[in-house]
From Swiss-Prot:
Has an essential role during oogenesis and embryogenesis, perhaps in modulating the levels of nuclear import of additional proteins. Modulates the nuclear import of dorsal (dl), Dif and male specific lethal 1 (msl-1). Negatively regulates nuclear import of dl and controls the accumulation of dl in the nucleus after immune challenge. One of its GO terms (molecular function) is small GTPase binding. The lineage of its organism: Eukaryota, Metazoa, Ecdysozoa, Arthropoda, Hexapoda. A zinc finger (RanBP2-type) spans 735-766. Residues 662-679 have a biased composition (Basic and acidic residues). Residues 515-570, 638-697 are annotated as: Disordered. It comes from Drosophila melanogaster. It is found in: Cytoplasm. PROSITE patterns: ZF_RANBP2_1. This is Protein tamozhennic. It comes from the Eukaryota. One of its GO terms (biological process) is regulation of protein import into nucleus. Disulfide bonds: none annotated. Residues 79-146 form the PUB domain. The gene is tamo. 'Tamozhennic' means 'customs officer' in Russian.
Amino acid sequence: MSDFVPHDLIPDLWDEILRRHWMFLETEESIEKLEERKQLEGCLKEFLCVVQHDRKFFLPETGHVLRRSVLELPDFSAQNAIVAFETISQYANNLFTKPWRKEYRTLKTYSGCFQHDIQSRLLDAEQLFLAMGYRRAAEDTFVLEGPICPDQVTNVSRDAMAAYVECQIMKHIYAGVTAAGYVCTWKDILQFRERYVGGTSTTIKEMVRQLSEKRVRMEQPPMQENTYSNVVSAAPTACGMRSNNVAHHPSSSGTCALHPNGLNEAGKYLPPYPAPPPQQPHLPGPLMTHSRSLDHYQEPQAHLPHRHSFDQQLQQQCQLPHVYEAPYDCLDGLSMGSSASYAAVTGAYNAPGNRYPLPYNISSQLNAPYASPADFYGNGQHTNMYATLGKTGPAHSCDLHRRQPNTSAAAAAALAAMQHRQSTYPPDHHLIDFDERAHLTQHDFGTHDYDPQYAELRGQVQPSMRGNPVAMYATYGGYDLPTTLPQAPPPTGQDMYIYARPVPKSSRMRALAEAGGINSTDKHPRSAEKQSTMDNNRKMHKELKERNSRTAPAKRSGTERDIPTTISDLNSYDSASLDGFVALDSSSSPPLMPKVQEGVGSFESWNYVFKNLERSGYTKDLGDREDLLVQSLDLGSLSITNGGAAPPAEKRREATNPTNGEKARTLDKKSGTGRREAKVVQAPAPSPLPNSSSAGVKKVKSALKTAVVDNRGTGSRQRTGAVPKQPPNVSPQLIVTSPNEWSCSFCTFLNPDTKRICEMCCRSKDFNLEAASAASSSAAAAAASAASVSHASSTCV
């Protein structure tokens, strides 16, 4: 199982290991066996200190288990690995010395010994058992079939002991390095042992030396480097604004670029490079300095008569020969390591026609190396990446006039810089456009005052309501809209781009064209910024449009068709369909509250339900009204009629006054419990009239499939005056039960029609609770109840 040839490397030591291992296995349990084990461990330790790491173990599985356990096991320690390898070695020794024991031929991985001593301390330890000759019979069972192979078992036993000794060596190294005052991990020790060959003391000395050098390198300051210049800057000592006898930067024209009086003859003709602040002498100078000339980009030409370089002083007349003859600008002001400025051209720096114009507001996008907006020379206390146009002017490069920043000022400056960068470009044309979820502010609901689409509605609104968007929406379209509109809190600077997502330019142009903002073929999309800032409804996101289409009332067509709201198919009987339902435009009505979407709510969201109830024969004077929130079936107002032409009042009279063979039974629901009473009217089977047609029969059958929800409310309802034709009322028996089931009169359990005994209470199908109570009082009442039972049984089927 291995190409390891130990005799070619150290024949004598390897022979000694093999001989002592055989003696250890054949020795009985005694003091002598302990001595043999100590001698064997000594030979293994000497062998592991003189061979390379890939030759330490005879089986490659042993090295794999040790390496993976050290690298991947979270709580690995050498002591835990010692216990695990010792257990594996002992198991192999028992299998070799006592192969007749049946318990050694079956290994259960869920046993306590395997779980606590092996599985939790090593990874892939099963590979060593497979190397012994076991095979996996199940997920948690290993079985050894047939006679054992002595060579395989002894190889695993010897390799497990070698790994046991290797873990002891790692443990000693860890203790030695820790005692020297350094911190190392088991992974560091294993990797060092894999690269270097040596004993315990040699490894400790070498690791301590490397850790010491690493600590020294970390304590040293980083090397000063300037990516854009070969000039190393030193810290200035003072500002030369008020005196000329102070020290100046050896390679600059002055310590403060804004104070021209601090010039000396030695540094007058050198290229001007800004100096870092003196409180950080060990840090490198700024890499991307801000051009002070760009701060005055829009000033008149007379203010900047001789500004040839970004950091050049006004009095500096002598210039070195320039490199390029084109009016280009070097944005970093450092000339890329050259001593001549790329922008050293004739004429004033900002003179018209002397240079190509920079992009829109690019001066606000340049910045010092990641400092605050008012700090152009790198303050380590600020981490703002974007610049802004400060009203106080650019700061000095010296620390003499710099105000000490505090924590609140730094936070406010960072916030202002972020907001200013976003406002630098037009609102719809940032450097990277985003598919943002726009916040709805209060001004969004006043768009109708500025949008032409609301011009035609202004004549319909009362003069007192003009200018009041809430009052206008309350009567818009003839509906009673809620008078309370959602008021979103004003968004802050941090909330403006929380849900931003980059979108391609083609999608942005198409979205703007669909919204009516710009033309898709427009070459200058920046003209869109001239549009009104209060047309946010035109760019409302997709979720708001869907909410409006679901909750807001529909635009009425010329015929004013009603929408049926029944449980069954809408086309089951002759009624109005959804063909006339026009989707509501997103900008014609304000969004309703989210609670209205969930079915609890306003009159306008349920108006189509009330319209359908009117078509079904519902009137105001049908009786006491129930709670609006109690939405259930009004079984008392449902009945089956043959003709379907009687007025609603007559139907109600017929339902409340049963005659001849009609009987009525009332469900036991007391009024004291707060629940409404529901009556089930049972009519005899309809018989066809002489003048009835097949179409009328089909209407009755289709009406039986429809259940109308009676949602009565306490508020006033508008009536159209005309009552459309209505479907016949439905019997509650057809709603509650199916044709193949019957409801028990005692426990209301639904039983299959094939059984006549209730499966829940063992009552008969013909059992009647009222009849049973009446039978105990009098015989006459029993006879009457029996007749009622016989009548009720015919309708439960």
